[in-house]
Regions:
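Substrate-binding/active-site clefts of carbohydrate-active enzymes
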Residues: 1-39, 64, 70
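Acidic/aromatic-lined carbohydrate-recognition and catalytic surfaces
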Residues: 1-9, 42, 49, 54-85
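Active-site groove signature of glycoside hydrolases
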Residues: 33-58, 138, 142
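Generic structural signal for well-ordered alpha-helices
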Residues: 37-38, 61-65, 122-123, 164, ...
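Structural preference for beta-strand elements that scaffold enzyme active sites
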Residues: 47-49, 74-78, 97-99, 135-138, ...
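Substrate-binding cleft/loops of secretory-pathway carbohydrate-active enzymes
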Residues: 58-70, 81-115, 186-195
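Glycoside hydrolase catalytic-domain groove-lining segments
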Residues: 108-134
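Loop/helix patches that line or flank the sugar-binding groove of alpha-linked glycan CAZymes
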Residues: 121, 130-136, 141-142, 147-251
């Protein structure tokens, strides 16, 4: 399957003839994409989150990422790779810094939080990584997934706290917090394109309630947050502080 509405770029793979690869001479798409990467890197961004990176030949990333890092050594490349069999390929050959841990830890923690699996299933997650756990990016929310507090997930942001502690403290790898997650954003608005599906729209101009309250008209003082927002935020602050400062967890 693929996105029907997107422009298709030729990375040098002949998908009509058995997926044969034609990488020499360097495909024109590679050169153009490298120029785009270098352009944005020059704007002092922190890094790139590469959507469905496994749908692009690993040979491209192997070629492009070192060139970007040569010019901008501190920049990060995070890949969305959902096939565990390709994890090491995109980490070690493709040169990515981190991969989303979606089909392993995220899916398991969601099932545990919703009562579909026992917490013992978490053991298989870390064992299956077998040495690359430090290269995985943990998360509980992102633009693709339903909000913890939504009716489609846990229905209450506090029910996600045990999963937060596991994600943040189990290993020394990074943990991503999606905007408004720390306030218990519901994601239950009926936005124009996607409707009420438990996600915050990425297709519409929309006002996210918890973020609007935190911004407070540009003051960014959080004074419009509810007591429930503030309480959850304090828990997130404590957990994230502990996982970064407590040596038993951070080392």
């Amino acid at each position: 399957t693929d996105w029907y509405e997107t422009v298709k770029l030729n990375y040098g793979v002949d998908y009509q003839n058995g997926g044969t690869c034609h990488f020499s001479p360097t495909p024109d798409t590679w050169i153009k994409m490298l120029d785009i990467l270098l352009f944005w890197a020059s704007k002092d961004i922190d890094g790139f989150r590469c959507d469905m990176a496994e749908m692009v030949p690993v040979e491209f990333w192997e070629w492009a990422i070192p060139q970007v890092k040569e010019a901008y050594p501190e920049i990060l490349f995070i890949a969305e790779v959902y096939n565990p069999g390709e994890y090491r390929n995109y980490l070690f050959r493709g040169k990515f810094d981190y991969l989303y841990d979606k089909v392993g830890l995220y899916d398991t923690l969601r099932n545990v939080a919703c009562g579909y699996e026992s917490a013992s299933a978490i053991t298989h997650c870390w064992q299956s990584l077998n040495g690359i756990e430090k290269k995985m990016l943990n998360f509980l929310e992102n633009h693709d997934e339903q909000r913890i507090a939504s009716d489609f997930f846990a229905g209450n942001p506090r029910k996600g706290i045990p999963a937060l502690i596991v994600s943040a403290c189990m290993n020394t790898n990074p943990m991503m917090i999606y905007f408004g997650q720390e306030f218990g954003e519901l994601g239950m608005d009926s936005e124009g394109f996607s409707g009420r599906d438990g996600r915050t729209t990425i297709f519409d101009y929309w006002s996210v309630d918890s973020i609007r309250r935190w911004r407070n008209g540009g003051k960014f003082d959080g004074k419009m947050l509810t007591e429930e927002h503030k309480h959850l935020y304090s828990i997130y602050q404590k957990v994230l502080t502990i996982c970064n400062e407590e040596q038993a967890i951070s080392k």
